[in-house]
């Protein structure tokens, strides 16, 4: 479809940059306060809050990337964009659920940092954001680039 040697690298770079922007927008500007407060509760209300945030996150992330591809003059197939959006939304939901991150912290001996919540530092929030920006966004960007050829 597109064989230019720099195309995949360009798609990867634009996707990654837009992914960072979409993440910040979705997590800090779009996410409703009530969802942020309830999404880790193991109740029907908590599950609805997590689902609500996941949906708004996925839509915001996908829209941000689509706008960036358009601005960069890139034609990225819908299949690549949709697959990456689904993978990132699922990953984001799993991270924001909190249980996997708590298990990771416990298994790796980082539970003290995970539970740190004083002096202006929140270890769990920092680990959450590191998971999003260090794992989830790169995964979505690499999937997009791989499927864009």
Predicted feature residues:
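Short amphipathic, positively biased membrane-proximal segments
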Residues: 1-149
């Amino acid at each position: 479809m597109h064989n230019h040697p720099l195309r995949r690298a360009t798609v990867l770079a634009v996707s990654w940059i837009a992914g960072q922007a979409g993440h910040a927008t979705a997590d800090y500007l779009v996410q409703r306060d009530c969802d942020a407060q309830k999404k880790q509760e193991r109740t029907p209300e908590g599950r609805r809050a997590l689902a609500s945030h996941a949906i708004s996150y996925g839509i915001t992330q996908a829209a941000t990337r689509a706008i960036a591809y358009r601005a960069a003059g890139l034609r990225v197939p819908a299949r690549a964009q949709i697959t990456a959006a689904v993978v990132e939304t699922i990953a984001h939901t799993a991270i924001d659920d909190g249980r996997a991150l708590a298990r990771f912290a416990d298994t790796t001996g980082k539970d003290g940092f995970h539970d740190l919540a004083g002096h202006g530092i929140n270890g769990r929030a920092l680990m959450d954001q590191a998971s999003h920006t260090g794992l989830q966004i790169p995964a979505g960007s690499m999937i997009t680039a791989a499927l864009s050829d």
